[in-house]
């Protein structure tokens, strides 16, 4: 009767043990990875939180979100805190001389989004005061935003965090209203920006509609209407809040009537986060 030599048995057993060990290590590594959604917050001064107040911002729901600080600490994640993006000034997105970031809508957005989806968010700051869409397309703003987004992905990978979904939130329009950007120009430029961000991995753009100018209600209307039309015509644009259009109480703005105070930012963020989360909950599997 033929028998397998003892040394071959040993080799066979060792090989089997190695295979089991590799499987076990792989399973362990899979279990230690977490999944989070990556969201980049883009726009101008009201996205930056120029009229906010950290002391009036909501507390973060435990486990709901983190901030990736591309400029000040690019090698790790921080628990989300206000003022969001406080010192994230660099290159084309450096607006240090224009405004101070005092408190944003981002924490309220993330809390509401997390309540809907149960998925934590890694938030990236990428806004600049007084920025028009043409500026985003021609002055290096979109490239700086892309660099920050891609750096966040690298950091998340290093931290063993799987990027489940990638989105952008857009809150902008005052600059284009001042420039008298036409309806067609605004829609075309916004579509170009979103298309560029999609090339960076963004799945959808969540849009917060611009609010009215309290001193001249007609001034912002063309851009406000263009934003609504763009969301109807472009499947990559998802309207998540029209609340700014309803917040016409002067007490909700700063003394210039331009920047929303923290009370308004909390309301806008919560509304947008809830609606964005509901969208992701329903359509999130449709990558």
Q: Model-predicted segments: where are they?
A:
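N-terminal Sec-pathway targeting helices
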Residues: 2-16
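A general, composition-driven signal for non-globular sequence regions
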Residues: 2-3, 23, 256
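Bacterial Sec-dependent signal peptides at the C-terminal "C-region" and cleavage site
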Residues: 18-35
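Cell-envelope and extracellular/periplasmic
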Residues: 30-287
């Amino acid at each position: 009767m033929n028998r397998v030599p003892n040394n071959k048995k040993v080799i066979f057993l060792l090989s089997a043990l190695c295979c089991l060990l590799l499987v076990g290590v792989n399973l362990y590594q899979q279990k230690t990875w977490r999944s989070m959604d990556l969201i980049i917050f883009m726009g101008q001064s009201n996205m930056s939180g120029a009229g906010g107040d950290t002391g009036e911002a909501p507390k973060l729901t435990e486990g709901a979100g983190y901030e990736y600080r591309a400029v000040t600490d690019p090698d790790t994640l921080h628990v989300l805190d206000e003022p969001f993006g406080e010192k994230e000034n660099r290159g084309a997105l450096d607006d240090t001389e224009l405004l101070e970031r005092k408190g944003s809508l981002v924490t309220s957005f993330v809390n509401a989004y997390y309540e809907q989806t149960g998925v934590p968010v890694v938030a990236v700051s990428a806004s600049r005061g007084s920025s028009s869409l043409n500026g985003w397309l021609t002055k290096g703003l979109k490239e700086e935003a892309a660099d920050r987004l891609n750096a966040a992905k690298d950091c998340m990978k290093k931290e063993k965090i799987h990027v489940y979904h990638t989105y952008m939130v857009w809150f902008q329009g005052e600059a284009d209203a001042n420039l008298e950007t036409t309806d067609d120009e605004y829609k075309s430029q916004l579509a170009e920006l979103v298309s560029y961000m999609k090339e960076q991995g963004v799945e959808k753009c969540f849009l917060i509609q611009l609010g009215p100018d309290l001193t001249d209600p007609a001034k912002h209307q063309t851009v406000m209407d263009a934003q609504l039309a763009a969301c109807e015509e472009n499947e990559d644009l998802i309207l998540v809040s029209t609340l700014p259009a309803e917040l016409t109480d002067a007490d909700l703005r700063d003394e210039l009537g331009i920047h929303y105070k923290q009370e308004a930012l909390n309301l806008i963020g919560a509304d947008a986060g809830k609606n964005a989360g509901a969208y992701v909950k329903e359509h999130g599997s449709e990558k």
